[in-house]
Regions:
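Short glycine/proline- and charge-enriched loop/turn segments
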Residues: 7-11
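Glycine-rich phosphate-binding/catalytic subdomain of phosphoryl-transfer
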Residues: 12-18, 25-26, 30-228
Length: 228
């Protein structure tokens, strides 16, 4: 057993609680390097490969990307209470509680605010989903983390189709080029194949180039939800 860590703190910018992409990657790289150092110190082994990897991170919030994979607006974390109108309207529409912090509430609030970026959305995800995507190329999310984006059908263990349809009907007059299911990650449950670490992903985690690609990665999950 070995460990590595990194301390970070969110920042308030333009009245939005956020982390930059640089914060995310520098923090992950620092944690990984500290893990490598711990393995070397304890066992005199240079870490190049592990049996499997999993990511868990803060749930909810809003990370929206265009078709080129570019972040459209700064990451809006779960701490933001800026979606009151959207949360209220969706709760009434779905007859299901949609808290302000959920990604669906953030998306609908951006629509209500007539934010320019909404028409360009190709993919929305959580922090764990973002990291997993960049390291594996897979746009997937564990069902636990997914349940903090949009309502889940507990029978199918997938997005609630009825509520997806209601959302699409609600925003149809806006004429966006997407349906909501098309921009959400694919939902997976524990044990399902979620991809492997790519060459690019390995270099993102370990810029020294020692970490090998091909390591299986489990579905990304919410707070402390992965591999525990």
């Amino acid at each position: 057993i070995a460990s590595g860590s990194h301390d970070w703190e969110n920042r308030l910018e333009n009245n939005i609680w956020t982390y930059t992409l640089e914060d995310i990657w520098s923090g992950l790289q620092d944690s990984y390097q500290n893990l490598v150092n711990d393995v070397k110190e304890k066992y005199d082994i240079t870490l190049t490969k592990v049996g499997s990897i999993g990511f868990s991170a803060m749930m909810h919030g809003y990370m929206a990307f265009d078709k080129d994979g570019e972040l459209l607006v700064p990451f809006r974390t779960w701490r933001n209470t800026m979606t009151e109108q959207a949360a209220k309207e969706l709760t009434e529409l779905f007859r299901f509680n949609m808290p302000q912090r959920w990604s669906g509430a953030h998306l609908y609030q951006a629509i209500l605010n007539k934010e320019e970026h909404v028409k360009d959305i190709d993919f929305i995800t959580t922090l764990a989903g973002y990291v997993h995507w960049k390291l594996t190329g897979e746009k997937v999310l564990g069902v636990g983390d997914a349940s903090g984006m949009f309502p889940i059908d507990s029978t199918t263990r997938n997005w609630n189709k009825e509520m997806l349809a209601k959302f699409d009907e609600l925003v149809a007059p806006k004429g966006y080029p997407w349906k909501v299911e098309d921009i959400l990650p694919k939902v997976l449950v524990a044990g399902e194949k979620a991809g492997t670490l790519t060459e690019e992903g390995a270099k993102l985690l370990d810029p020294t180039g020692k970490l090998q690609a091909g390591i299986p990665v489990c579905p990304p999950e919410g707070d402390a939800g992965t591999g525990m």
